[in-house]
Amino acid sequence: MVCLFLGASSFIWSLAPAAAAFQLPRCQLLNQTISLEKRGCSGCHRVETTICSGYCATKDPNYKTSYNKAIQHVCTYGDLYYKTFEFPECVPGVDPVVTYPVALSCRCGGCAMATSDCTFESLQPDFCMNDIPFYH
């Protein structure tokens, strides 16, 4: 049994150089176009911002206990500030101003659902709901 485990282990380590050659980009700042929309305001406006994107090393133990909880790290904001955008045409009574984040630094950590999209696969950042045809 031990020999089988060591054999499998050495087989996996022999694949390590091939995996390292793939070179996933580490968690870093990335310039990105995002879309801004607001109910009561016309159009979809694309703006440039800086987001966090990339790979974070993580571990998932084979033998799980209450002492070794697996925490999956994601690339998330370190420091950020918010910019404002004013929509040119909004119906009366609607505040035309929206804010969006601009990343100043990135880090690998737990996903904060209050500030990040923690889903497996989400909409692209420049996606506009206004671009979807509406059928009656």
Swiss-Prot record:
Cleaved signal peptide residues: 1-21
Cysteine disulfide partners in this protein: C27-C75, C41-C90, C44-C128, C52-C106, C56-C108, C111-C118
Source taxon at top rank: Eukaryota
GO terms for MF: hormone activity
Xref: SMART domains: GHB
SUBUNIT field: Heterodimer of an alpha and a beta chain.
Family that this chain belongs to: Belongs to the glycoprotein hormones subunit beta family.
Name of this chain's protein: Gonadotropin subunit beta-2
Encoding gene per record: cgbb
